[in-house]
């Protein structure tokens, strides 16, 4: 590595970073309520409509949005048109919070308009018994309304019903709210005048839904291919280690496997909170749910770490048998890897920006990076995501697959192309329309990483992939946190 190449690569890296900052994927100003606001609104709602004070109960919360509806609108090409509607009715920019106490819990959905859009009481039936004011459907709607543009201001009563459950009468009110291309069927259940359930069923008013379903099936199919690829890679790695006369060092593979396990534990707290909010059952204690979350995280880390360990062991052995220097000159590899990651970010951002301006590509922030910078996402989660994806994918698709395909074909170009194609199609390209542009970009990026692997070694592509993911994931988060700190006392604005 001479001084000229050092300077040239450094300049390209700086230019790449500047291009990314200037042309990075679009974001939308957040109107999400603070966690404390969502908690207070939920406490007051439960006190008013259920008659129970949950202020001192254990509290858990996560950011929530309706990914399924947003994804369908994106593929129909009408997401931008309905973006404000999604916000108004709480299908984006919402909180899901849960209060837990003595095997009882309440789940509440709160949108940015300070309205309750979801509620479920997971408590004994006798808790909801006793005298309580029974209100009419219209009166209930007026009491739940908190904004002239929100869900309840758009809701129109369509019917009522009554049934008996456990010898108690349950009243049901049905409403329909329409806005833009979205129709919401709202159901409210009351026991003894107390609200026990509020739920919505979303419907998109279109005759193109069959096309969207086919597109989603394509995404799911390619997503499954990633898991199958990992399983086949591990089987192939075991066969190489058992039947081929290869020698390798175990230390680096152990380090990679242990790093995966450690990274998995970085987000343990967030994973447990997500599990409690979305899947807690009053028949189980919070400690039990937490323990199950810990065991699940550890098991996932062990399984993923084992796959990485076996595949890296086989890939390193095969590459060493070919005389490839995959781990030599680590400082040089790290330098070129950092530069390559920044260069790829800049080129990608510039290219996507030009394609969007020419209307050849449509990127939806709600799907591509929306949840990255909103409340609840932490740097630890970004670090975990970046490390795990870079190690797991590079071990399988570069360190193992390129030597294997080269051994089978005898052609290094074929090995780079095939491994890059398989790596590209295993990605779910949610948020990009048409999808093939994103897949083509991933294929080209994969070929770039393949060339770096052959030219410099495995550490280079590992660092390049890590830097690319870390900056892409965490820069919006850092900007959001900085803007939130700088404008803490100023009113929020939106570009919806």
UniProtKB/Swiss-Prot annotation:
For membrane topology, the record states: Multi-pass membrane protein
UniProtKB keywords: Antibiotic biosynthesis, Bacteriocin biosynthesis, Membrane, Transmembrane, Transmembrane helix
One Pfam family from the record: Rce1-like
Q: Which GO terms describe its biological process?
A: bacteriocin biosynthetic process; CAAX-box protein maturation
TM segments? 1-21, 224-244, 248-268, 291-311, 331-351, 399-419, 443-463
GO cellular component terms, A-Z: membrane
Q: What does this protein do?
A: Required for production of the bacteriocin SkfA.
Protein's UniProt name: Sporulation-killing factor biosynthesis protein SkfC
Q: Which organism is it from?
A: Bacillus subtilis (strain 168)
What lineage does UniProt assign to this protein's organism? Bacteria, Bacillati, Bacillota, Bacilli, Bacillales
Q: Gene for this protein?
A: skfC
